[in-house]
Amino acid sequence: MNLVTTIITITITLSAVLATISFWLPQISPDAEKLSPYECGFDPLGSARLPFSLRFFLIAILFLLFDLEIALLLPLPWGDQLNAPTLTLLWSTAVLALLTLGLIYEWTQGGLEWAE
């Protein structure tokens, strides 16, 4: 058995064992005491479960997408040293065009507007 097959087998086995353990370990029926918020032993003054802003979530997702884009384009200056630099530049241009179209779509749909 070669090294890659051994590593893949160990990874799959470990993942299955951890998924099974995480499925069976939590309590099946938590009581009201565990579901209540804890504020230093005092009764909560207000609702501890505040609604999460969906706008903030969308902007955070957009930030992650463009951060990933920058990470993908960082090795681009070394791409011109390959045998076929035209293909590398073509793919990077396609990625930039796709993300630019996505940004334009989000902008036209109002996804970047913080206040309505």
UniProtKB/Swiss-Prot annotation:
The keyword Isomerase does not apply. It catalyses: a ubiquinone + NADH + 5 H(+)(in) = a ubiquinol + NAD(+) + 4 H(+)(out). Its main location: mitochondrion. The chain crosses the membrane at residues 3-23, 56-76, 84-104. One of its GO terms (cellular component) is NADH dehydrogenase complex. Keywords: Electron transport, Membrane, Mitochondrion, NAD, Respiratory chain, Translocase, Transmembrane, Transmembrane helix, Transport, Ubiquinone. The keyword Metal-binding does not apply. Its EC number is 7.1.1.2. It is found in: Mitochondrion membrane. GO terms for molecular function: NADH dehydrogenase (ubiquinone) activity. InterPro entries: NADH_UbQ/plastoQ_OxRdtase_su3 (IPR000440), NDAH_ubi_oxred_su3_sf (IPR038430). It is a multi-pass membrane protein. It comes from the Eukaryota. It holds the Pfam family Oxidored_q4. Core subunit of the mitochondrial membrane respiratory chain NADH dehydrogenase (Complex I) that is believed to belong to the minimal assembly required for catalysis. Complex I functions in the transfer of electrons from NADH to the respiratory chain. The immediate electron acceptor for the enzyme is believed to be ubiquinone. Belongs to the complex I subunit 3 family. This is NADH-ubiquinone oxidoreductase chain 3. It comes from Oncorhynchus nerka (Sockeye salmon).
